[in-house]
C-alpha cells in the first residue's frame, strides 16, 4: 500500500521549491528592471543536490509561473565563496568572479603598504588571483622590495554574471536570467494578457461568446507596449471576436484595468 502522506509531502516539497524559485526569479527581474509580464527567453536555475527532480516534476508550472520560454536546472553542491564560483564556472554558467579583501585580516600583513596593496589589488585580474588561490591557497603581491602574501581566508570571493544576464540568489538557490529581448515573444505575452481582459469585459457586458462585435479599443498603453502590438490588431481582433481593434478613444465606456503594473483602459462594443 502506498503511503499517501509521503506523496503529499513530496508534492508539498515541490510546491515550496517552486514558490521559492519564483520569488528569487522576481528578485532577478527587479534587478534587471524586467516586469513580470515580459516573457524571459532563458533562465538557469541552480538548486541543491537532489532537488532537480523535485522541481522538474512541476515543469509546466515552472514555465508559466516564471514566465520563461526555456529553462535549465543545475544541481550544485557549494553554497558560497570561491568553491561556489568555481563550480558554477565549471558547469558553464555565465559567471564572473567578484573579489574583495577581508580588511580586518590584512591590516597586520600589509602594514605601511596598505594603500599600495589596495591599489595593486584593484588593478589585478580577479581570475589570476583565483587561479593562484586554487593552486596554493595564497596569493603574493610584490610591492617594490616588499612582498605581501595573503591567504585564501583574506579574500572574500563571490560571483556576478556577465552583462547579458542578471541574477538573484538565496543560499544555494540561484536564478540567472537572460536579458536577451525577444520582441515577438513579448508581443505575444501582452496580446494574451489584453485578450484575456477584453474577453472578461465581454462576459461582464453580457455579450454572447459567439457574437462578432464591432470593435475593441485599448487606451493608455505606454510607448514600449504600443510599439510591440500596434501592427498586431488583427491577431487581437481574432482572439476577442471583434471586427477591428483601435488605440483611440472611440467607445462610450471604458474600463480601467491593470496588467502587472501597466495601467490600461479597455472597451468593447
Task: Show where each model-derived region lies.
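Feature 926 captures the class I aminoacyl-tRNA synthetase adenylation module centered on the KMSKS loop
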Residues: 1-269
Amino acid at each position: 500500500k502506498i503511503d499517501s502522506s509521503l506523496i503529499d509531502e513530496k508534492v508539498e516539497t515541490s510546491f515550496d521549491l517552486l514558490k521559492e524559485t519564483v520569488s528569487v526569479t522576481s528578485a532577478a527581474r527587479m534587478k534587471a528592471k524586467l516586469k513580470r509580464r515580459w516573457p524571459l527567453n532563458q533562465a538557469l536555475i541552480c538548486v541543491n543536490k537532489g532537488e532537480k527532480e523535485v522541481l522538474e516534476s512541476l515543469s509546466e508550472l515552472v514555465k508559466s509561473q516564471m514566465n520563461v520560454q526555456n529553462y535549465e536546472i543545475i544541481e550544485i553542491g557549494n553554497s558560497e565563496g570561491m568553491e561556489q564560483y568555481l563550480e558554477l564556472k565549471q558547469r558553464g554558467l555565465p559567471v564572473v568572479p567578484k573579489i574583495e579583501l577581508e580588511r580586518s585580516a590584512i591590516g597586520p600583513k600589509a602594514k605601511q603598504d596598505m594603500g599600495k596593496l589596495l591599489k595593486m589589488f584593484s588593478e589585478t585580474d580577479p581570475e589570476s588571483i583565483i587561479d593562484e588561490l586554487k593552486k596554493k591557497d595564497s596569493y603574493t603581491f610584490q610591492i617594490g622590495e616588499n612582498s605581501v602574501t595573503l591567504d585564501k581566508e583574506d579574500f572574500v570571493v563571490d560571483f556576478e554574471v556577465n552583462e547579458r544576464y542578471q541574477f538573484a540568489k538565496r543560499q544555494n538557490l540561484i536564478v540567472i536570467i537572460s536579458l536577451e529581448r525577444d520582441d515577438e515573444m513579448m508581443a505575444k505575452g501582452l496580446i494574451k494578457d489584453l485578450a484575456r481582459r477584453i474577453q472578461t469585459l465581454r462576459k461582464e457586458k453580457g455579450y454572447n461568446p459567439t457574437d462578432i462585435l464591432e470593435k475593441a479599443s485599448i487606451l493608455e498603453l505606454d510607448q514600449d507596449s504600443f510599439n510591440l502590438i500596434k501592427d498586431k490588431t488583427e491577431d487581437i481582433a481574432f482572439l476577442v471576436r471583434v471586427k477591428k481593434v483601435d488605440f483611440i478613444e472611440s467607445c462610450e465606456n471604458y474600463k480601467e484595468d491593470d496588467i502587472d503594473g501597466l495601467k490600461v483602459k479597455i472597451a468593447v462594443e
